[in-house]
Amino acid sequence: MKKNIIVGQSGGPTAVINASLYGVIKAGLERPEEIGSVYGMVNGIEGFMQDRYMNLSAKLNEEELEILKQTPAAYLGSCRYKLPEDLSDPFYPVIFQKLEQLQIGYFFYIGGNDSMDTVSKLSRYAAANGSEIRFIGIPKTIDNDLIHTDHTPGYGSAAKYVAATVREIALDASVYQQKAVTIVELMGRHAGWLTAASVLARKEVGDNPLLVYLPEADFDLEQFALDVKAALDQQPNVVVCVSEGISDKDGTFICEYGSAAQTDSFGHKMLTGSGKVLEAFIRNRYGVKVRSVELNVSQRCSGMVVSMTDIEEAAEAGRAGVAAALKGSTGQMIAFRRKDGETYELECVTEDVNLICNQEKKFPTEWITKNGTDIGPEFWDYALPLIRGEAKRKMKDGLPVYLYRK
Amino acid sequence: MKKNIIVGQSGGPTAVINASLYGVIKAGLERPEEIGSVYGMVNGIEGFMQDRYMNLSAKLNEEELEILKQTPAAYLGSCRYKLPEDLSDPFYPVIFQKLEQLQIGYFFYIGGNDSMDTVSKLSRYAAANGSEIRFIGIPKTIDNDLIHTDHTPGYGSAAKYVAATVREIALDASVYQQKAVTIVELMGRHAGWLTAASVLARKEVGDNPLLVYLPEADFDLEQFALDVKAALDQQPNVVVCVSEGISDKDGTFICEYGSAAQTDSFGHKMLTGSGKVLEAFIRNRYGVKVRSVELNVSQRCSGMVVSMTDIEEAAEAGRAGVAAALKGSTGQMIAFRRKDGETYELECVTEDVNLICNQEKKFPTEWITKNGTDIGPEFWDYALPLIRGEAKRKMKDGLPVYLYRK
């Protein structure tokens, strides 16, 4: 008997989270004998609990789907909503009743660690309560911090944005003769994957960024001052890339030296300003011209600088999710496995979502070199294939055309 | 008798200042009967006084010239160097001797207000001292604040970057249900042209950015609070675009409420942080989620989001400069005149550089609407043609290929 699909997006936006949505919708449309409609939760599980959803398969035509595939941010809207730990909480019978009413057979949630926690809880409740609804997680995060997957959709485009933008900032910083330090602050609370991507900006060895600091290595202000001085002796224009989440050996975030930290609904520290703190520190210490640049949200939502490899892989993750669910999988996350061999090849597999949720994949400390100021060659081999390929963007009047939820 | 060309770049980088350099070099190469070599000053007039220059026509091949045309920032390097006001200063005989030694007949300086001041002084010294060297200014600034020209090369690409990026930031800001304010701070010390470009981000009337504040209108914190509240009553996600240079009715820069201001060598106030000041103000006032985003240097140095119209016009300005100089012009700046008629057409003319230097073209106050919070339709007609057209970028391994001075 035919069942319906429901799909939601959760957590922070990325450049390709809609490509995964595209993949789920396309795969659903291609299986009319098993799939009725493809519904979308508006604002994730939080919106769905308020009965906010839409029929995507009925609403979107072929052309709109192609635009959706290249639209950044989350078309369905997102949420940061943590499900109750206690599976006997009244929340669960309510949501399962809503799912049954819509004759949902397959539930897909596109997101990161916290979203996989949602998939884990719903699939465990289903198993314990005899529901046949299958729950699959589709990975998504620019932070690239999900375990049991080679990388995550969203990282390749964010890494490409960071590398291209830092290359341009280094060019900009090089136009004057006067000694100057430019500090670029990059996203990544606890994992340095995105900050590491800044080294791809180098066109050759010895290029800026000369110094790169990840959260995985303890940050020491005095050592930093020495590092910057040595770099300035090497060349007049020094570009430094730091993660928003760098902290000292006592675990105090550098940004806390300058600004009070707030906390989001998952208890994450909301970080800003490590770049500003270091800017003031170096200016006061050496009296040189110092500028700090926070790349901010464009890292995750730029649709102008995206990796076509990332878009295609994100779409494939969505398709693979539907295929896995129809084969009977539940409580699984779609993961990427890199095939051995010279050329880059990827396959989609499924991994137990319960082993993935609420875990963080750190940047390998053995890839961090030069006393915590640089990244080793292993990272180039890992990351370069992920940023390749240019999207053929639809433009109108000189601006990108995106799909908006009406 | 054959003479040589020397060309320099001065002031802040733009996405197309190298396209103007390309235009000068190409035009020089096309007139072998009149032009010997095309020299480039390294780091502008400051570097040239240190005998730092290069032979561009001998050094760059056809392929390198095409890459140069699409390379952001300043290939030759730049400077901020103010020539002595007193034309009897020993500086002048020294530099003219250097120019004569190189058999320079034609001097081109690509830059903004301050660079035109350099062209003015050198051309006046030449006239007063019987030198036949001809001095021509090629306009360049993302600020679009040069008078006697329809617009300036560099503005179109910066405006396109701002419009595209604000459109994406608005998309990113719209994914959550919770009320939130995003404040985007844009470049423009005293002229609001670039901040005005943020309204082009709207796909339809009533879209974000809902509020736009330019330096040309007095900024009032209490009125701002009321504007934001009214906007939040309209929709949950409000994007506000402000110029770095907004100031209150007493002329105090809003950023000064929060941070100390520094001064550059031209006496300009170096502004940062109006966005941060307003972020804290609104958060404290209303307790809503507020984020501020400073677009920073990518506005002027992004090569990934550029206007092909801007690139071609910048190259044409360089060519027109050479043509004007060979016809006998000196002490002139190349200016753009928009032809009347339905379709956008531009012609290059020459204007007296002495009337242009050290002047600022403000954004027309009659184009500022809704009590200083929006921009009128005249601006769309003015700006849309300037951001059209996509550059075919040369990419390698997923990253842009640029030309670097060796």
Question: Which positions does each model-derived feature cover?
Answer:
Chain A
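Glycine-rich oxoanion-binding loops at beta->alpha junctions
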Residues: 51-105, 114, 153-155, 167
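N-terminal phosphate-binding or glycine-rich loops at protein starts, especially the Walker A/P-loop
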Residues: 1-53
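Accessory alpha-helical/coil subdomains and C-terminal extensions
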Residues: 98, 106-111, 117-129, 136, ...
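Short, ordered loop/turn segments at secondary-structure junctions
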Residues: 10-12, 41-46, 80-81, 112-113, ...
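Gly-rich Lys/Arg/Thr-decorated short loops/hinges at beta-loop-alpha junctions or inter-strand turns
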Residues: 4-8, 68-81, 140-150, 177-180, ...
